[in-house]
Amino acid sequence: GHTISNATSTGKKDDNGYATAGIFGWVVSGSVKNLTVDKANFQSTGKGNYSYVGGIAAVAFAASIKNCTVKNSALESKRDYNNNCAGGIAGYSTGATFKNCASVSNNIQSMAYGGSFVGENDDDNDVGNSTYTDCYAVNCSVAAKTEETSGTSFAGGFIGMIVSDIALTNCYAYKQTLSTEGTSASNAATGVFAAY
């Protein structure tokens, strides 16, 4: 496999108002395998429409991610956006396949949906359900905090928010620090595996 160390990204916004930060911004119907990301610093701040931050992919859309690890990294999605996600492996997943992947000792912050592995899983895009096999998250810190009183703050030990059915096989999360402390959101929650 390959290792990428000390990578940085500040989340450039595209013409459609999406800001993404990660080794890959979007992985659409493609695959990433045998990759380790160590000591990355990925951030998305400012104003716009959508903000996604992930250690491997900001957005995994009908993608295959296998044998990948993200460790010792800082992943922050703090844009004043409609949808705001950060996750150790992917910020946002829809119809993606994850196998033999790990999120280890990462610091993850989001204004809305933060997860040690994936920030938000939403499979309502007609590409099938996301699947997770032999994946884990350990020793990560996840914080979800916003100043918007009408907002939502979810911090999950594996996934921040799950919108639709997913398939999980032999996946686990432990030794996580989860927080929504200081949020002004009217709807806030933490969950050992998923916040919502």
Predicted regions and their residues:
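Predominantly extracellular beta-rich ligand-binding scaffolds that present long acidic/polar faces
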Residues: G1-Y196
